[in-house]
Every structure is written in structure tokens, then in C-alpha cells.
Amino acid sequence: IPMTIFGPDDLTLIKEGPSNRRTYIDELLIRTHPKHLKQRTDLESVLKQRNAFLKQQKGYLSNENQNTLTVWSEQFATLSKQWGTVRQETLGEIQDLAQQAYENLVGGTEKLEIIYDPQWLHEGLLPLLKEAEKDEVRRGTTLIGPHRDDIEIYLDGMPARTHASQGEQRTIALSLRVAG
């Protein structure tokens, strides 16, 4: 019997930062499309290795290490584009389900929107990584990509995190659980 569990921690989907929403959509994506698990694992591996390389530079990137960073950046950009695309597709699949669940729960006509539209997915990640390279080397971490994205949730055009009441936030979180 399929079952949906809803608990107090589910409010973090709405109230807390973007990492909770990324985790929710990524877990949903892998649960509904298990074929993408390897893609996610590959992305995490390349990100981990790229970050380790950036940390090793200790704030300075020599010319000889520039080529290595370029290779990591190219791999990361390719895998990120694939992951960002399947994230968008998955959110497209659950948008209507979440809206319907919300309407069924409240009996109203408020519009629930789930938006994932990272700038890098349209412009290409590689040029943005190149632009952020000095800062990334200085900080020793990757600053742009799917690991930093947010999935925004709106109720009637207003950010649910800041403008929805606590009851509305609970209903939105429940709608997302039911949709997934």
C-alpha cells in the first residue's frame, strides 16, 4: 500500500533554506526515475573532486593547474546541465499534481507554483564557472551549479516562505508530499 508520511520536518521544505528543497526534488526524481541515480552519483563525485582540487590550490592557481581545473569544470558543467534538465522535467511532472492536491485540501483557487529556473542552465555553466574561477580558487569550493540552486515555491504569485501563513505553509508542504 503506497503511503505518504507527513511530519513536522516537512515544513522545512517551505520555511528553511534551499538545501531542503533540493533534497526533496532530488529524492523524488530518483524515486520516480531510478535510471538517473548514476547521473546524480557521477555529478556528486565530480563536484567532490573539483572541490578537493580547488582546496588544494590554497588560493592560488598555477598555469599548469589551470588545465586540470578546466577539465573538472567541463565535466561538472556537462553533468550539471543533464541534472538541471531532469530536475526541471520532474518539477514539471509534479506541478499539476501539487496544485491539484492543494486545491483538494483547501477547496480554494489559490495558485501554487514550483519554479526551478537557474540562470546557468540557460546561459551555460562553463562561462559562469570561468567568471567565478578566481573566487572559487580563493574560497576552495564550487560556487555555482545545481548544488547551490533553489526551488522557489509561490502561492498566488508571492513567495510562500515569507508570505504564506503557517497553515498555508503546512498545506503546501503536504501538497508536495502527496504530489511526490
Regions found by a protein language model. Give the residues of each.
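Extended, charged alpha-helical "arm/stalk" segments used for dimerization and assembly
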Residues: 1-53
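Short, flexible active-site-proximal loops enriched in glycine and acidic residues
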Residues: 38, 42, 56-66
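General structural signal for alpha-helix termini and helix-helix connectors
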Residues: 27-34, 52, 56-60, 78, ...
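Conserved NTPase motor "head" modules and their coupling/switch loops across ABC/AAA+ ATPases, GTPases
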Residues: 60-180
